[in-house]
Regions:
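Terminal helix/beta-alpha structural elements that buttress the NAD(P)+-binding lobe
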Residues: 13-49, 56-60, 64-91, 100-362
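N-terminal amphipathic/basic-hydrophobic helices that include classical n-h-c signal peptides
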Residues: 1-16
């Protein structure tokens, strides 16, 4: 199979469009709080800076990070007002004066963190990756954030995911949970996890043992099976204690935290809390010298030295047909308040997207 790599601009036309300011539609969180603070506005976007590339956004990703940023609990986030959009796929429309790696019209994607829920985005050239034209855009977009995060959880956060090991994943029918499940199964692990009961039948067909989160029966069941070698927990806060409790104790085991979704699960009326204190407590468990259990916290970081290496690896897996990204729901940009109002109630499994270009598939 062909290897997915950036570039390809050297032998292609280099004429640049005239650098002008454009009028665009974009999403804005006017203040932290409920969905009423989400709107789509008309704004101006400046030409790309020296080392930036301006892209016409086709699809933007939508995930729990959007909800966390709206309520103001995403770690180290910007202050409101802000434009969300953690990742995107689109086409290059203009290069900055010192950018030449990609050519106008080339299909690209990036982990943007902000500003992708807009018709155009300016982004540093170093964060872009080229996407082969034969790869489905939404599949590629799912890889950039959800599946790349899962790849890091499986291959960077621990070395214990392997054949015969028991892996427990909370929120296994979510975008990152489903991706983590798939990559663990590819490694030969036995996979267990919590999910909405409506998704249990489809998960069993994949060879997974699902549990209902709310009744806590999964704790006794996993202990009866000997405990988990790895637990992935995106819920955080006090929930880390329950996850720690189901780790196997007479063999090396690891609890990996990767989120603070308790803020979302508690509903709009609950007071949001900072994730930082619970993360400190999670990592403090490593100070216990009389156990083989350990902890870590993983987050995706586009400036990490292994980020591009991992992204290329998982994009190549997609290109080789080793997995497919299930799509749960796609919304139009102009209806962006809807996912904020219905988050957590959407049936199905997989990744969610925002269609920015109305001519793209919905």
């Amino acid at each position: 199979m062909s290897e997915v790599r950036d570039g390809g601009a050297a032998n292609l036309p280099t004429r640049q469009p005239k650098m002008t300011t454009h009028t665009i539609r974009k999403v804005v969180y006017s203040a932290f709080g409920g969905p009423s603070n989400v709107s789509v506005v008309t704004a101006q976007i400046a030409p790309p800076a020296k080392y930036e590339v301006q892209c016409d956004v086709i699809y933007s990703g939508f995930s729990g990070a959007d909800i966390q940023m709206r309520i103001g609990t995403y770690p180290l986030q910007k202050s409101a007002p802000l434009t969300p959009g953690y990742c995107f796929v689109g086409r290059v429309s203009a290069n900055g004066p010192k950018s030449s790696k990609f050519y106008p019209g080339q299909l690209v994607g990036a982990l943007s963190m902000y500003d992708a829920e807009a018709q155009k985005i300016n982004i540093a050239e170093k964060y872009l990756i080229s996407i082969p034209e034969h790869v489905d855009m939404r599949q590629a977009l799912g890889v950039i954030l959800d599946w790349n995060t899962a790849y890091g959880l499986v291959h960077r956060a621990t070395d214990l995911v392997k054949k015969g090991q028991r892996v427990f994943i909370h929120s296994i029918s979510g975008a990152v949970g489903y991706a983590t499940m798939t990559l663990c199964l590819l490694e030969g692990a036995e996979v267990y996890g919590t999910a909405s009961e409506r998704n249990h039948a489809s998960l069993r067909e994949l060879g997974v043992t699902p549990f209902t989160y709310t009744d806590k029966n999964w704790k006794a069941e996993m202990k009866q099976r000997g405990g988990a070698h790895v637990v992935y927990d995106p819920i955080g806060f006090e929930h880390y204690n329950d996850s720690w409790d189901i780790l196997i104790r007479n063999e090396p085991s690891r609890l990996v935290g990767f989120g603070g979704n308790m803020n979302i699960l508690q509903g709009e009326d609950a007071k949001p809390r900072s994730q930082f204190p619970s993360q400190v407590k999670l990592l403090a468990k490593n100070g216990c010298l009389v156990t083989k259990r350990s902890t870590s916290f993983y987050y995706i970081d586009r400036d990490r030295s292994t980020y591009m290496e991992d992204l290329h690896a998982v994009m190549s897996m997609l290109d080789q047909g080793k997995f497919e990204v299930p799509i749960k729901k796609t919304w139009d940009l102009e209806n962006i308040r809807e996912p904020h109002e219905t988050w957590g109630k959407i049936p199905g499994v997989g990744s969610c997207f925002v269609r920015v270009d109305p001519n793209a598939a919905l």
